[in-house]
């Protein structure tokens, strides 16, 4: 019996619950929210869709952390979403307080769970959660790289008019304006993307525009929605991570993880390719970055560190 608890029953939380149900990733799903009515209402609504879609999963909604006991996976989406004109970093003070409460609830009731954080600003929130909760770093990860990579793949597929599943691509670094798309490691139908640039299928200038659109991918959606931020693609990305852990898939996925010397970086969470299996983060893959990529990656790391310093001033417990 596999149990997944979702902390936050907003747009991402509700979508996560529905996806987990339709894909039967777990046997039980608990939707937790401080607004218990929203959690209970969504849980009941999704449960009522099970006979239509033909899945067999138990759903419940709660505002009591005791109900997440014995969870195999916990996905955190609790927090305030962005509004137009806001960066992910603008959410820092509000969401830091929320993450601290969530960390206490999980530490007390489900300390053995594999925890996936989706709350923004992502890299600092997952670092703060790990620090507040004391859970082992290999069991605490952030969802960012899968989402950023999926945006990069989509924009390339639209530009090159090829199916998105034919594109292999990866984005590293922090989940923000300094993220690092990696065209050099990108393949289209097995062919290096940079070969297509040489052949004139896509210009270097157009490729850079796609890189920038990837960095702005979340903001573009926030601008359209006006109230709220992306939720379908973030939820799908979170489910992929949960599946890799529960099914011991040993899958290579770009995730925000705790770096301890890899890529020349220590004591920081940032997006890199990792293997996820039954032990959580089982291996951090170190790909050979060139000088330009290294410079961009370190610039992204510096941005994460600067935000971490700001967070530490808001809550001195993070400096301990």
UniProtKB/Swiss-Prot annotation:
GO molecular function, one term: L-malate dehydrogenase (NAD+) activity
Residues holding NAD(+): 8-13, 33, 95, 118-120
Superkingdom: Bacteria
EC number in record: 1.1.1.37
Catalytic activity: (S)-malate + NAD(+) = oxaloacetate + NADH + H(+)
SUPFAM superfamilies in the cross-refs: LDH C-terminal domain-like, NAD(P)-binding Rossmann-fold domains
Leader sequence residues: none
Listed name of the protein: Malate dehydrogenase
Organism of this sequence: Pelagibacter ubique (strain HTCC1062)
């Amino acid at each position: 019996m596999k149990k997944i608890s979702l902390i936050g029953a907003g747009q991402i939380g509700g979508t996560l619950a529905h996806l987990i149900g339709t894909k039967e990733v777990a046997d039980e799903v608990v939707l937790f929210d401080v607004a218990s009515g929203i959690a209970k209402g969504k849980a009941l609504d999704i449960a009522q869709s099970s006979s239509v879609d033909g899945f067999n999963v138990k759903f419940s909604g709660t505002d009591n952390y005791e109900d997440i006991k014995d969870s195999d996976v916990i996905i955190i989406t609790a927090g305030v979403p962005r509004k137009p004109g806001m960066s992910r970093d603008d959410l820092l003070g509000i969401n830091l307080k929320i993450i601290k409460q969530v960390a206490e609830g999980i530490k007390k009731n489900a300390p053995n769970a594999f925890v996936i954080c989706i709350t923004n600003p992502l890299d600092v929130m997952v670092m703060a959660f790990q620090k507040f909760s004391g859970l082992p770093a290999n069991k605490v990860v952030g969802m960012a790289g899968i989402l950023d990579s999926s945006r990069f793949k989509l924009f390339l597929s639209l530009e090159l008019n090829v199916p998105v599943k034919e594109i292999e691509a990866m984005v590293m670094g922090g989940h923000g304006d300094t993220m690092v798309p990696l065209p050099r490691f990108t393949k289209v139908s097995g062919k290096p993307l940079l070969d297509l640039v040489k052949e004139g299928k896509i210009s270097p200038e157009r490729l850079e525009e796609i890189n920038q659109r990837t960095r702005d991918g979340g903001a573009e959606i926030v601008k359209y929605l006006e109230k709220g931020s992306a939720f379908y693609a973030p939820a799908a990305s979170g489910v992929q991570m949960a599946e890799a852990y529960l099914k011991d898939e040993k899958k290579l996925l770009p995730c925000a993880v705790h770096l301890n010397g890899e890529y020349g970086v220590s004591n920081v969470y940032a997006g890199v390719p990792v293997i996820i299996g039954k032990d959580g983060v089982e291996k951090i893959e170190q790909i050979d970055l060139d000088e330009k990529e290294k410079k961009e990656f370190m610039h992204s790391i510096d941005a994460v560190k600067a935000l971490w310093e700001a967070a530490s001033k808001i809550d001195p417990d993070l400096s301990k």
